[in-house]
Amino acid sequence: MYRRKEAEKILSSNPDFQPLYKQVYTVLVRRIAEGVWRPAQALPSEQSLAQELGVSQGTVRKAMDALATENLILRRQGKGSYVAEHTQEHILFRFFRLAKPSPKCDRIIPQLGSESVKRRLANRMERSKLQLGKGDQIVEIRRTRQVDGSPRVVEKIILPLKLFPEIDRQKSLPNTLYSLYQSEYKVSIAVAKEELRAISANKNDAKALGLNPGAPLLHIDRIAVALNGQLVEWRVSRCNTQDLVYAIEVN
């Protein structure tokens, strides 16, 4: 636990003006990132945090509201606030957008088909995407994913080996990797930044997805960012969205 003077130093160390609740938010995110509070662990009460940080309870509540809005914590009525855990349900809600067309746009997580994993040196593009140095190693995971038994997605996932040591030696990798990152490597994904565009299937895509070359695909380029701001995963997905949609909720 941070002592009061240490917390006050953190709150006063920001050279640029930030609202007080934003400074409290930054302190709380840092503690989650550093493992002071583990996934699924209850956070101290708002009153306790306010006393420790030397701010009002309302300021802490506003910071907690921001954490909840970003799905970094979960609130349970009558029980308090908990660090978000990357369960399959949580991952589905936050990071997977493919859905079957319906009024509810029920999302799906495509199931794992084939998979290959290898370790190698990062190339120039990978170093640029993940802010790696020359000579850094990465793990490349290639997957096909299925919906109702039919291949729908080809994926290439690039991970910095220094963040995920020996991940390529795992006996088997789970369908949803974010839970593994959190439980085994203490890396919690805070944000996923995506770029989408329409492309035509090349010969490899067509063969993997059972399509004709030139068939339309949805190309999703995603960078996953950890709680501490570090870029931890580059994922490229090429999706056959026939009878599927990419669903987004805009508040």
Which positions does each model-derived feature cover?
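Residues in the helix-turn-helix
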Residues: T59
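Short, hydrophobic-biased segments on the C-terminal half of alpha helices
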Residues: M64-D65
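C-terminal all-alpha effector/ligand-binding and dimerization domain
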Residues: P110-N251
